[in-house]
Amino acid sequence: MSAEHPGTAWEHIGEKVSALSGNGPDYVDVFVQSGAGHSVTFEKGRIEEVSSAASGGVGARVLLEDHSVFSHSPDCSVSGAADCLEKVLSRARLSSSGKTFPCKVSISFDPTRLKVPDVSPFGQLDKAIRASSPFVRQVTLRHRVSGKRILVVRGDGNLVFDERFHSLFAVQVTVEKEGTIQTGYEVRAFQSEAGAFWDRVSPTQVGMQALERALLMLDAIPCPAGRMPVVLSGEAGGTMIHEACGHGLEADIVQKDFSVYRDRLGEKVASPLVTLVDDPSIEGAYGSYTYDDEGTPSRMNVLIDRGVLKAYMTDVQSARKGGIPLSGNGRRGSYRNLPIPRMSNTFLLPGKDNPASILEKAGRGLFVTKMGGGQVNPTSGDFVFQVTEAFLIENGRVGRPVRGATLIGNGPEALMKIEAVGDDLHFEPGMCGKDGQSVPVTDGQPSLLIRDLLVGGCDISDAES
């Protein structure tokens, strides 16, 4: 990340945007982006796919009282930004100052700054995984690196410049035993350049963990169905919190009356053990940034404080509409998209309970260590989540692995039923999709005990037979 100044040519556009925002429309801003990326897939003992791409452009927006006007262009030069701004002003039926903007500076990202991923260790890792078990049928290794520069000309005329790098390494292992096929998946992703990324990531460790997950599920029994205590480990990664709670706290969803948390600021919405935060300022986390895509500085936002709803995540439009503070959560998939409120690094703060004591407190039930996909209705809070790795809790201890489990419930009700929160906060990276836009995020949680939750699986008598 950098605080490098983009140059005086952009300041002319800043002066114009500032003058416009103070005379007519509610808000005017310009977003400029330039970036590049590389991706490598290693499969079947060889490099299967290599791709590289570079892209850039500009988006200009005018916020009026009840709607927004937006235009974008693939030209990220100063003159391209000026032309795009003129176009959106024309569409919004606003007059410009008639100034011209000299094209002296470009924020173009130099693709040569991104090193092509070194895949020389991948062959050795592939062989090591296959040699570790006769049941291995497929090994897939993926590595992605990307970098981009952004410039935001804010509504007050100020310029915000930022650089962002992301690196990801993922391993998927498929195993087969007596006709049963299972897959293990493990991923590491941070906001960092490739060199710093590999300083903190061991490819061998990631690969072997993926293999262990796959092999574990080969001997799993069908999951019993019914209501029972559920312990979500830190490794479950906060997926349920992200989906069943986080999206409902994004202000645009709240204002469209699609959220179960609408008009509930100051009310108790969770157990007093629950404090939920969103923090894009965490150094190196996959969902981090110094400024959001509207130029608002990042900061930690406490959304739920000891069970009480304190804040929503906002962008400029939703903050103005609701008369609520800017939280720094205005994000875009690219320059082609309007900013919308999005999560960044969203997690429950750790508690004081030892994870082993949480299992003892549960006594019996389901211990979830890896979550899959699911569906959530933000209006009601109802959810259904797949579980990719879980164990029975038997006499307060981890028991047999189970497969085919689903978690069925209601977000606010589940938050109210949290009876213990561990001291073992764990983060998992991912990509979050909303309104056709995808952005990097991190979800996190410590181990926690939900008093009772409906678990879908098979009939209990079938599992015991």
Could you say what each language-model-derived stretch is?
Residues 1-465:
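N-terminal small-residue-enriched
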